[in-house]
From Swiss-Prot:
The keyword NADP does not apply. Signal peptide: none annotated. Keywords: Chloroplast, mRNA processing, Plastid, RNA-binding, tRNA processing. GO terms for biological process: mRNA processing; RNA splicing; tRNA processing. InterPro entries: Domain_X, Maturase_MatK, Maturase_MatK_N. This is Maturase K. The gene is matK. Usually encoded in the trnK tRNA gene intron. Probably assists in splicing its own and other chloroplast group II introns. Its main location: plastid. It comes from the Eukaryota.
Amino acid sequence: MEKFQRYIELDRFWQHNFFYPLIFQEYIYAIAYNHGLNKSILLGNAVDKKYSLLIVKRLITRMYQQNHLILSPNASNQNSFWGYMKNLYSQMISEGFAVIVEIPFSLLLIYSLEEKEIIKSHNLRSIHSIFPFLEDKFLHLNYVLDILIPYPIHIEILVQTLRYWLKDASSLHLLRFFLYEYHNGNNLITSKKSISIFSKRNQRLFLFLYNFYMCEYESVLVFLRNRSSHLRSTSFGVFLERIYFHGKLEYLVKNLTKNFWVILWLFKEPFTHYVRYQGKSILASKSTSLLMHKWKYYLINFYQCNFSVWPQPRRIYINGLSNHSLDFMGFLSSVRLNSSVVRSQMLENSFLIEKTIKKFDTIVPIIPLVGSLAKAQFCNVLGHPISKSVWTDLADSDIIDRFGRICRNIFHYYSGSSRKKSLYRIKYILRLSCARTLACKHKSTVRAFLKRLGSEFLEEFFTEEEKVLSLILPRDSSTSRGLYRGRIWYLDIICIHNFADDE
C-alpha cells in the first residue's frame, strides 16, 4: 500500500481529513472492481475512462435528484425504472466510496502490525485459529457468557461514531445517503437476512460498516479488560480477519470519572477471555457466578448508553462449562470430565487411584447440518437424499466435482471434531444425492449409475486428509486409526461458505 500512496495522493487527503475528492478519481473504481492494486491501474486508463470526473459527478447528481413522485399514466412503470436507475447509480458510487473509507483503517492496521512486529498475521485470519485457543484456555475456566450481540443500531449513531475518524462532512453526507437509500428505515442491521441483502448490493461497504460497529463495541471491552486485570496483556495484538473482523483497538479517550474506578473494581479478574465470530461472542472466566451476573448487567447498560440499544437479558446466557454445551461456529463445545482408575503398588500394598482429567470436547451438530443440506435441496427435512434438479443441465464431471467439493469442504471444516462418525451420514447424503442427480439427468435408475461409475465415483468424496493418510499408512494400523480419529485444525479457512453458493 505504501508504494502506491504517492499516486493516490493519500497523505495529502488524510492530513486534512478530506476524502471526498477521491470519489472522482477513476483508479478508485479500478481498485473496487478489480480488487487489487498495481502500478498500471494507477498510471494508465484502468477502466477505459468509464469513471471520469464528469461521469461520476453526473451520477452523483442523478442519484440525489431522482424524483419518485412522477404523476403520469405510466407512473408505476416510470417509478420502478427510476428507482432501479437510482439504485444502480448509488451502487456504482458506493463501490468506490467503500474503497475510500477503508484506506485510513487499513493503514492504521498495517502500522499497528508493524509496531507490534506481527509478521505472520495471516494465520490469525483463520476461523479454526479460535479452537486451539479454546482448547488451551477453557479447561481452566468455570463460566461462560454466551452473548448475542444486539444488532439494531440507529443510522445517525453510526454516522456520529464515524465522525471521530472521518471528519469530511461531504463524505459523511454521502454515507448517510447510502444508509437511508439501502435501508429506508431507522435500523442499519436488523437481522441476518438484512445483512445478506446488503451484502448482495454492496458487500464491501456494509461489511466495513458492520466491522466498524464491532470494532467500536469491542474496543471498550478490551480497554476495560486491560485496565482491570492484574495480569495486563503486553502483546494484545491486532487480529486481522478480512471479511468479518477488521480490527481491535486498545486506545480510548482517557477521560475517566470517579464511578469508572468502581466498575473496574468489579471486573478485576485475570482469567477472562473473549472470542467473537460475526454477531455472537463468548466471554469466559474463572470467576464466580456472581461476577458473571455483574458482567451481564454491565453489558446491557453498556449497549444502552453507547449505542442506544435496549437488548433483552435473555440474549445473554450464563452457562457453566462443566454441564452445558456451547453452540459456537457450527460446533457444540463443552468441557468433559474423563475419569480413569490407576492401580498403584507400594511394597505389599496396592492402591486404586481415581483420576479426573478435563477434556475440551467438540461435537458436530448433525441436525442443523442436515437442515442446511435440506435448505440447499440436497435432501428432505428427514435427511433422505434427493436429486439436485437445478444442476441437471451441467456436465457429469461438473456435477460430480461440485458434490465432491462440498463434501470435502464439510469434512475439512469439521476435521477438528472429537466425534467424526456423524459426518459419514453427511457423506452418504451427498453421495446418494449426486447419484440421484445424475440418474435424473440421464433418465436412469440410481442402481444403474452406481454400478456404472463404480469405485471412481467414490474417489470424489474422499477428503484430502484421507487420501494422504491412505498413501502413507495402511488403514488398519494403530497410528493411522489415531490420525483418523484425531483433531486437525487448519489455519487457511477464512469463512464458512453457503451450500447454495455454487448454484
